[in-house]
Each structure stands twice: as structure tokens, then as C-alpha cells.
Amino acid sequence: MTESQQLVNKLWNYCNILRDDGLSYGDYVEQLTYLLFLKMDDERTKEPYNHKSDIPKKYNWQTLLDREGSELEAQYIETLQELGKEEGIIGVIFRKAQNKIQDPAKLRRLIVELINKENWLSLEADVKGDAYEGLLEKNAADVKGGAG
């Protein structure tokens, strides 16, 4: 199994857990996109990149890692809302963003066990692209299979 396939399977397995709570594939990919953006921004601020983040410190990746339960859920909701008000590309990415993950324990698991365990910037661009494409393909196949 390739690195891309392993990553798609990990992402997909977690998606199935969230689907039990009524989260659609589209919603999952959307939430994953927001969280991955925050995680990759955090990675860019560290060695060997050392870039300055455009995300205000009170809404960065670490603020999500530092919280659990209802505090995590509240922080995530506030982060999405406030980043949507930012100028430039940050505001565009997060405009009208909403939390769709209703279970704070599952949100924490997604953040800590899935997203935070990977160093996303070190992955080849093809791996990230393949993973995203794989999720979209699985989504399309599932929607097509369920449309009967």
C-alpha cells in the first residue's frame, strides 16, 4: 500500500466515525480542510521553515491542541468565526466557516490522533493531492452507490 493510500484510508476511516453522527462527506472534507490549514500554518512557523504566521496567536493550531471538551468546541467555533473576519486570504478561506463536528471528543480525536500526528508539510505534494483526490473519489462512489 502506498503512502497516499495509507493516508486516504486513515482519513476515510475517521470520516466513517463522524458519519455516525450525521456528518456528510462534504462536511467532513470541509472541516478537514480548515483543520489542515491551521496545522500546516503551525508547521510553517517551526524549523526548518521559520515563517511568520498570518493567523492571530489566539486562533492558531496550538490553541486547539491545548483544549478539551466544551472548551475545545468553543475555541474551534470562535476560531472559525474570527478567522472569517480576517483580511486577505485567511478571511477568504474561513468566510462563513462553521463547526459541523458536534461531539467535542471526536473533534479532539481528529485534531490530536489524526491531524497532529502527521507532519503535513514534509509529505510530498503528490501525497497530499492524492489523499484529497482519494477522499473525493470515495465520496463520489458512496454517493453514487447510495443514489438508488
How does the language model describe each region?
Residues 1-148:
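Non-catalytic, mostly N-terminal accessory regions of nucleic-acid modification and defense proteins
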